[in-house]
Amino acid sequence: MLPIITKTKRRARAANLSQFFLMGLLFSTLVSRFPALKELYGLSIAELGFIPFAMSAGSLIATPICVFLSAKYGSRKVGMFCYLQTLSLCLFVLMPEKYMLFGVAVLYGALMELSDIAMNANSIIVEQAYKRPILGMFHSFFYFGMALGAVISIVTMQIGLSVTVHYVVMSVVAFIWFAINHVYYLKETPAKSAANQKFKILLP
């Protein structure tokens, strides 16, 4: 029987590998169906191109908040924003007006950034627990997830599955998937200096 500490580390590593895979799967699912979103809402090429721009803006806005929250509360707690990210995927196909998509894109970008930083921070804790470099393995699983997401999207397009059904089903699956992953995230105790730190934006 393996020692408890070894089981904990292995489960945390598996959970982080699974989480990187899931994040790649979600990202690939979203962008690979952009042509279907264009058709669903009657977007122009310029309007479609503004969606990834809005996502980037959301990520940029959220970055200093992510760093502050991770330092103050720890990556495991901040990682819970991924619940909202998984659910927000389906918002892309449920908006009554196309211009509301851009607000959804900003929100999704911000939530994706929060989830991503928390995931990376927790993977560093796992690497420290293993006392050997394993971050590269985590990041490789992101691209495996992207590859699977692309394959699934190709299949859904070939069988004529609507982007609405695709996104809603993926949102539900991803929500459950993350709930399982999050159970095995390693906990960390934030430093006292970080716990008492007030939010501020640091300029270069």
PLM region spans:
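Helix-to-loop junctions at the C-terminal end of transmembrane segments
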Residues: 61-74, 157
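Helix-loop junctions at membrane interfaces in 12-TM secondary transporters
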Residues: 93-105
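Symmetry-related core transmembrane helices of the 12-TM Major Facilitator Superfamily/SLC fold
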Residues: 164-183
